[in-house]
């Protein structure tokens, strides 16, 4: 089947999620427009061992060509995102988290947004985190530079142009994403914090537009296991991967003074928490992780971004 024949490719990158992934796929199969359109579901699965029930469900769907089930041998979020982009057979690709409940009109609204906004390369849908409800917000960016749109409320009910992204409910023109190299694989797996913001900043700098579409809504379950939570808590860890992405983003895209302020703010903010107030012995542990993260990010920022090679970008 050619890209022209497919209307939409849904890509779900999953890590250490079993039954919640099966539930998410089940919700998608029952959405408006799914049965009436040429839509494919691609699961880029980084889970080594599924529960027996999940393994059976995924295998059955794969054998019946309900899903395309791609297995990867190790977790690497941006690598998996790029794999999904390359495998997609539609001109439009919709990335979704593996632990969501989608609104019944999710697919229709993403497709409609691209039809209404042909100059837009990326559409970000509404994301309701646990306990959140939709909220009318007349948003105006209060900050510029690295922090521009960092505080954008993705539960807003007002559509607008944005300069940030959340990959858990993001549709894009495949050609646009490929032209800019996809997602940067310098981000340390599996956390890869700020990779969406880096992607958005890179596209906006190149003249691309990103539209926030509130009608394309999901409820994010924020499952307590799997995903980026598989590496434990950032509060008491000296590991660098929790902070690497934030520093790397700043070093890649910030002007010198903006970058310095951003990095220093993060360094001190990370220990100004209720947890560290009651567990002060973890402050030096956390700072050790932040120092390691900064110097790893500094080294990585001096290298070319690890994007999809030109030779692999089949538009």
Positions of predicted regions on the chain:
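Conserved donor NDP-sugar-binding/catalytic core segment of glycosyltransferases
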Residues: 105-138
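Non-catalytic, C-terminal membrane-associated alpha-helical segments of glycosyltransferases
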Residues: 237-241, 255-315
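Acidic donor-binding segment of Leloir-type glycosyltransferases
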Residues: 27-71
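Short, well-formed alpha-helical segments that are part of the catalytic scaffolds
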Residues: 17-31
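Short aromatic/hydrophobic "clamp" motif used to bind/position activated sugar donors
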Residues: 93
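Glycine-rich, basic loop-to-helix element that forms the pyrophosphate-binding segment
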Residues: 72-88
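Short, flexible, basic/aromatic active-site loop/helix in glycosyltransferases
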Residues: 142-163
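Acidic donor-binding loop at a coil-to-helix junction in glycosyltransferase catalytic cores
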Residues: 189-199
């Amino acid at each position: 089947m050619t890209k022209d024949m497919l209307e939409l490719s849904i890509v779900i990158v999953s890590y250490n999620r079993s039954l919640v992934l099966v539930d998410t796929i089940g919700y998608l199969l029952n959405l408006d427009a799914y049965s009436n359109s040429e839509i494919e579901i691609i699961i880029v699965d980084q889970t080594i061992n599924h529960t027996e029930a999940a393994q059976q469900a995924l295998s059955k769907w794969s054998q019946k060509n309900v899903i395309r089930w791609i297995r990867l041998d190790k977790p690497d979020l941006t690598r998996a995102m790029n794999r999904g982009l390359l495998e997609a057979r539609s001109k439009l690709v919709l990335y979704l988290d593996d632990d969501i409940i989608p609104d019944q009109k999710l697919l229709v609204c993403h497709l409609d947004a691209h039809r209404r906004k042909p100059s837009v390369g990326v559409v970000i849908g509404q994301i309701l985190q646990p306990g959140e409800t939709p909220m009318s917000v007349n948003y105006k960016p209060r900050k510029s530079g690295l922090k521009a749109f960092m505080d954008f409320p993705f539960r807003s009910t007002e559509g607008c142009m944005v300069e940030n992204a959340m990959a858990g409910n993001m549709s894009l023109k495949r050609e646009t994403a490929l032209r800019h190299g996809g997602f940067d694989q310098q981000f340390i797996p599996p956390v890869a914090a700020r990779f969406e913001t880096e992607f958005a900043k890179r596209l906006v700098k190149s003249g691309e537009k990103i539209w926030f579409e509130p009608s394309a809504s999901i409820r994010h379950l924020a499952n307590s296991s799997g995903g980026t939570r598989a590496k434990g808590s950032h509060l008491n860890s000296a590991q660098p991967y929790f902070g690497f992405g934030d520093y790397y983003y700043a070093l890649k895209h910030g002007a010198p003074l903006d970058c310095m302020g951003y990095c220093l703010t993060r360094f001190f903010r990370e220990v100004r928490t209720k947890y560290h107030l009651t567990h002060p012995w973890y402050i030096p542990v956390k700072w050790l992780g932040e120092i390691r993260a900064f110097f790893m990010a500094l080294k990585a920022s001096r290298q070319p971004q690890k994007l999809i090679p030109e030779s692999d970008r089949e538009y």
